[in-house]
Amino acid sequence: MKKMMMALGCAVVIVATGCGRTTNTDTKTKEEVMMNATNDTALSSHCARLFAAAKEADVPTVVEGGTFMPTLYVATEKGGTMINLAGPESIDALRDMAAQTMREKVPDATAYLLDYASFYEKDGAHKGALVMEIADKADAAAKVFVIICNRDEKSVYDPVRHEDVKSLFK
């Protein structure tokens, strides 16, 4: 992935949403959440582990987020962009809203990354397939990357445990 990202010339966007939930951070402020995401010692959180692995692999990284809402993270040649998708009540509405937003705000996107937890798990959607459908509806020529880590320390897209997360950046 690292070589592919470098070839595309875009940053890796590390997800900060839900950061540190294992330490009961539902009441934390956005600043506290971001502090946890960027603190090398806060490895109890999924995004801190991803962030540390990316840094170790010398991958250019932008940390975005800190909300507790469905959010799509977009990597462009100029850096990372966060699109907040709170509101839609259905997968179809969410997909349409995301596609329209991407067409309007990030037409030059080179990669998309999707948050792990709050993206409508209750609907049972396969998130890897969903983000590709969104990119397709947005007429994006982008290569789609998905990094999704669950609180049970495995990905719903591709079974990767946290201790093996460095392999994502090789």
Region annotations inferred by a language model:
Residues 46-61:
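Phosphate-interacting basic helix/loop segments used at nucleotide- and nucleic-acid interfaces
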Residues 11-12:
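Repetitive helical segments and hydrophobic/amphipathic motifs
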Residues 110-170:
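Low-complexity intrinsically disordered segments
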Residues 1-8:
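Bacterial N-terminal signal peptides that target proteins for export
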Residues 63-87:
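N-terminal interaction modules that seed assembly of large macromolecular complexes
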Residues 20-31:
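Bacterial Sec signal peptide processing site at the extreme N-terminus
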Residues 15-18:
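C-terminal motif of bacterial Sec signal peptides marking the signal peptidase cleavage site
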Residues 82-122:
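Mature extracytoplasmic domains of secretory-pathway proteins
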